[in-house]
Amino acid sequence: CSAVAVRTLRPLSLSARAACSSEDKITVHFINRDGDKLTAKGKPGDSLLDVVVENNLDIDGFGACEGTLACSTCHLIFEDHIFEKLDAITDEEMDMLDLAYGLTETSRLGCQICLKKSMDNMTVRVPEAVADARQSVDLSKNS
């Protein structure tokens, strides 16, 4: 009898979880290299790289290393008021950002920024071009 009860409750709990998660979604606006606005949603705790990948956003070359801090292709530029609220940058992220194209004072790597509810409806800008830090490393190994 208890096995039957578990089977009938399981779908209810899954649908309840789905309803909660859709309400908890955070909207992020990306301005791509062409100046087009791409809007996507993610869950609290998702990285901005996760949001781009899971929503199949068309941002060429974004996240080439899949979030392993081995490139700078997920480089994003934040508005000042959002940048000031981001968690502290690590030395590893700073090293990768040093190799990023179009570095600004409000640049961060999308793979290192996790969504919080306070970020709902934020807009981030993708730089005009991308530099893949892995290629720079590969080139220096060959010389």
From Swiss-Prot:
Required co-factors: [2Fe-2S] cluster
Transit peptide: 1-19
Span of domain 2Fe-2S ferredoxin-type: 26-130
GO cellular component, as recorded: mitochondrial matrix; mitochondrion
Similarity-based family: Belongs to the adrenodoxin/putidaredoxin family.
Functional note: Essential for the synthesis of various steroid hormones. Participates in the reduction of mitochondrial cytochrome P450 for steroidogenesis. Transfers electrons from adrenodoxin reductase to CYP11A1, a cytochrome P450 that catalyzes cholesterol side-chain cleavage. Does not form a ternary complex with adrenodoxin reductase and CYP11A1 but shuttles between the two enzymes to transfer electrons.
Name of protein: Adrenodoxin, mitochondrial
Provenance organism: Gallus gallus
